[in-house]
Amino acid sequence: MDEDEKDRAKRASRNKSEKKRRDQFNVLIKELSSMLPGNTRKMDKTTVLEKVIGFLQKHNEVSAQTEICDIQQDWKPSFLSNEEFTQLMLEALDGFIIAVTTDGSIIYVSDSITPLLGHLPSDVMDQNLLNFLPEQEHSEVYKILSSHMLVTDSPSPEYLKSDSDLEFYCHLLRGSLNPKEFPTYEYIKFVGNFRSYNNVPSPSCNGFDNTLSRPCRVPLGKEVCFIATVRLATPQFLKEMCIVDEPLEEFTSRHSLEWKFLFLDHRAPPIIGYLPFEVLGTSGYDYYHIDDLELLARCHQHLMQFGKGKSCCYRFLTKGQQWIWLQTHYYITYHQWNSKPEFIVCTHSVVSYADVRVERRQELALEDPPSEALHSSALKDKGSSLEPRQHFNTLDVGASGLNTSHSPSASSRSSHKSSHTAMSEPTSTPTKLMAEASTPALPRSATLPQELPVPGLSQAATMPAPLPSPSSCDLTQQLLPQTVLQSTPAPMAQFSAQFSMFQTIKDQLEQRTRILQANIRWQQEELHKIQEQLCLVQDSNVQMFLQQPAVSLSFSSTQRPEAQQQLQQRSAAVTQPQLGAGPQLPGQISSAQVTSQHLLRESSVISTQGPKPMRSSQLMQSSGRSGSSLVSPFSSATAALPPSLNLTTPASTSQDASQCQPSPDFSHDRQLRLLLSQPIQPMMPGSCDARQPSEVSRTGRQVKYAQSQTVFQNPDAHPANSSSAPMPVLLMGQAVLHPSFPASQPSPLQPAQARQQPPQHYLQVQAPTSLHSEQQDSLLLSTYSQQPGTLGYPQPPPAQPQPLRPPRRVSSLSESSGLQQPPR
């Protein structure tokens, strides 16, 4: 009994422990089963254990590969992940990663291609690498990519795992906002090797599907790819920031009306890198891209006109020397008291490159072209009109621009963009402007003859001004026609379209040259005519002044030889500046001819009169010389000066003079000539414009000097008790000999025939129309020093002659106003 009870107790405890163990094992199996993927049905314990074992084996293999490929911690910063470190390395090396199949299809490209070449990754994916290369390099690059297939049809794992890198150089096409621009290539370097990958998606519609034959291709599922790092041969110092997704980042700033920074938001430093104190006081145009300055200037003008607006997308230079795309909403704030514009408030938003490209192409009225048209080497046009900022950069590639094949050219973005700066130069040649012009200019070129009028002979009064040189914008609009390049797949059709464009430009240039040559010939003929008229006027002036001494000798036999010599010197001094002067205006020529004719006619008339009219002739000739020497470019109305000298001399006066003085003595003529030879100095030409129009009427008034002038004693004057001596005043406006001061000198010897009141002598000089505002200068005529004992003439008391002013030189008028004073 006791043994049986002991056995039952042991059996019960053993069963209890086994049950506990089985329950614990079932819990673990159930937990493993829940952790396995794809648990759609209930699995037994054996299946669960098999799957767990398989997962552990895979995990061990992956861990081993990760340890091999993982970057060692000794040279990689611990706070950077592998992806971040790879991106930083690519940016520092000016490179990107690309994966290309053996037939040239691009299956992967990193995002760093955008700041380097301007392509979006989505545009490059599933395209063929040969589409981005010049035609001269297609065969060479294709041989490099298919080189491993020539060695063996099925690459061995040892060949694929070899560390021998493959390096080669080529040119890669640059991306641009405008696909119509002439293609530009960048010189790059490929460094990489071949790797095998499974389940690589086959590209579709890349244009090179039939390049390789089916037997030469690697079987599906065992694709071999060329993985390489692409670097620029010429490093870029200014790169475009790669922002593919819209980050919705913005910041505010405040500017003056001249667009200088006055305030910067705290959100700006993480975006542009500048602290507020680094940009305050600087102009916003210092941070903008050179290609966006013209568009931003237009936006600034629009803002100043309307007070608010939105700018276009533009590039802003960050502190890290990268271009970031921004778009600004701005408005002008006004002072609350005087309502004057105070400053400009701007809200800047970050824009992605993809959005900018879509917006620019919409502005250009272009549809998003397919891959063949986007990366084609030929210029293709959809027939839409191009805006002025579209340029044909044909001159940048030289003579190879006419060829459809793309010649390799190592040009960076900075050198490529600097070629557009010639548009802002006003002195650019038409050849350079041809590359920068806008195409819609045929209507302006058709009206070219109307825009260049040739002045006729009716405008001979004024010299024809030289033709104004047209600005760069007008010249380019006249030169370039509106040419539409039809998109043709054949290279010869593309060549013919380009050739027709250059032929049209050549015809426009030849037409412009013919018009300019005709204008030059017309101007030369007009200049020749003016020179002939100048020679005629100068010859007449020489004859006039050579005849003047002979006229004076015919009436004054007592004139001394030294007076004749002084008169000849004076005439030579007047003639020499006129002969040495430059070309004059036609208005001056005509006035000088009329002046010389009137002077010759007056001298011939005066030669038939008595001694007293001789003095009037000398007075008129002196004033005529002064009037002719004061001819200025401002007016041609001085031709009316000599005919307006109305001198009235009665016959009775000349008879009295002949009876009372049988042997006349005209020694006082010399003193009168000396006084009249003083220069009449008007104001400088610059002061003519400074006068108000209301002062013009005052210049013609008569100015009287009541105390400072001496009395002019006329030999034929009536007695002092019933007459007054006339007072001569010579003005630039009007000069009138009028009786205004009584004479107290007795004249008992005056004959009775001369007691009649002689008519007053009026010397009237009309002021020129263009010299109304000149200063009126008066000549103070001293009294005659009459010889004592002369019959019939009163003897005035000896008066001290007024000192003569030294002649002054007026640079703005003729040099004849500065004649030397003859010796006393």
Swiss-Prot record:
InterPro entries reported for this sequence: bHLH_dom, CLOCK-like, HLH_DNA-bd_sf, Nuc_translocat, PAC, PAS, PAS-like_dom_sf, PAS_fold
PAS domain ranges (all copies): 82-152, 237-307
Cofactor entry: heme
Main localisation: nucleus
Composition-biased stretches (Pro residues): 794-805
Location relative to the cell: Nucleus
Domain PAC: 311-354
PROSITE patterns: BHLH (PS50888), PAS (PS50112)
Spans annotated as Disordered: 1-21, 367-437, 556-667, 681-704, 739-824
SMART domains attached to this UniProt entry: HLH, PAC, PAS
Gene3D superfamilies: Helix-loop-helix DNA-binding domain (4.10.280.10), PAS domain (3.30.450.20)
Function according to Swiss-Prot or TrEMBL: Transcriptional activator which forms a core component of the circadian clock. The circadian clock, an internal time-keeping system, regulates various physiological processes through the generation of approximately 24 hour circadian rhythms in gene expression, which are translated into rhythms in metabolism and behavior. It is derived from the Latin roots 'circa' (about) and 'diem' (day) and acts as an important regulator of a wide array of physiological functions including metabolism, sleep, body temperature, blood pressure, endocrine, immune, cardiovascular, and renal function.
Protein name: Neuronal PAS domain-containing protein 2
Protein species of origin: Homo sapiens
